[in-house]
Amino acid sequence: MISSNDFRTGTTIELDGAVWRVVEFLHVKPGKGSAFVRTKLKAVQSGNVVEKTFRAGEMLPQAILEKATLQHTYMEGEDYVFMDMGTYEETRLSAKQIGESRKYLKEGMEVNVVSWNDKPLEVELPNSVVLEIKETDPGVKGDTATGGTKPAILETGAQVMVPLFLSIGEKIKVDTRNDTYLGRENS
């Protein structure tokens, strides 16, 4: 059990038979009446976001999530197959369960698979990944690092804005949390 006073961004709770993650929270102490906690919760399974208010100090069941580092081995139809490299046990996740993470997911990549009650819920990618540029406008002599940006499509199909001097075939580091270019990768 966790008190609503202990909510922090990222805290997970069980509510109505589902797992919810606290996205935002605000402790409110009005002049009259008792204090309360206004939250914005995101359903881990479906991605729905709701606003909910709890009394200050209200006790709620905390969802204990388990993380396992698995390797994405291959796709089978619409399912992504992950393998625990220690036990060689396979776990399958649907495209819906993976969500936006799939735009940076490539075969051979190690990720954290988050489970609740032995059911896989979502995939947590590393904060940054190295991917190759597959499609972009060609770089032109004179384009500088301080100039503008252009769209580039990466090997996984993700699109990010990159500096003008980059060209097809170069490997770049991308922040998976906010889809931004971090720099060239020397390989």
Swiss-Prot record:
Q: Which superkingdom, per the lineage?
A: Bacteria
* Annotated pathway: Protein biosynthesis; polypeptide chain elongation
Q: Which PROSITE patterns match?
A: EFP
Where is this protein found?
A: Cytoplasm
Print the keywords alphabetically.
Answer: Cytoplasm, Elongation factor, Protein biosynthesis
**SMART domains on file:** EFP (SM01185), Elong-fact-P_C (SM00841)
- What Gene Ontology cellular component terms go with this record? cytoplasm
Look up the record and give one Gene Ontology term from the biological process aspect: peptide biosynthetic process
Where does this chain mainly localize? Answer: cytoplasm
The keyword Glycoprotein appears for this protein: no
- Ranges in coiled-coil conformation: none
Q: Which GO terms label this protein's molecular function in UniProt?
A: translation elongation factor activity
Question: Quick one: signal sequence residues?
Answer: none
Primary role: Involved in peptide bond synthesis. Stimulates efficient translation and peptide-bond synthesis on native or reconstituted 70S ribosomes in vitro. Probably functions indirectly by altering the affinity of the ribosome for aminoacyl-tRNA, thus increasing their reactivity as acceptors for peptidyl transferase.
Q: Which family does it belong to?
A: Belongs to the elongation factor P family.
- Return the PANTHER family for the record: ELONGATION FACTOR P (PTHR30053), ELONGATION FACTOR P (EF-P) FAMILY PROTEIN (PTHR30053:SF12)
What HAMAP family does the record tag this protein with? Answer: EF_P
Q: What is this protein called?
A: Elongation factor P
Organism ancestry: Bacteria, Bacillati, Cyanobacteriota, Cyanophyceae, Synechococcales
This protein's gene is called efp
